[in-house]
Amino acid sequence: MTDVKVFNARYTFSTKGEIEFVDLSDKVQETVLQSGIRNGIAHVFAPHATGILILTETDPSLLNDIRVFLEKTVPRQGAYEHPSNAHAHLRSVLLPPDKTLPVIDGQVEFGTWQSLVFVETDVHPRKRTVIIQVLGE
């Protein structure tokens, strides 16, 4: 029986503001390689109330469609009780702050057009961190 290894890493980056997309795919793959884990899972978590993770294609037209969807679904202006950025919090509850991806033969497995993307929903530039945990053998 093989012991399960756990490798933890943090990646910190800056965002410029509302509905910005940051592709994290290469950083997750780099972390998997650093871990030495060949088979298992990579779990990525964004510990923020106004940031989400999505698996999507990074075509600019699709990213714009996602932006428009979020803006129409939860408009910036509304009868919100929370001051200043309620819409950012509400957009973040639509999608989870984490994703789990398979690791096979030392590689993160993405679909043909998939990338792991952080979506900034807050209105101000922010320093953001994601926690990347790789488990396996």
Predicted regions mapped to residue ranges:
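Active-site histidine-anchored catalytic micro-motif
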Residues: T2-E137
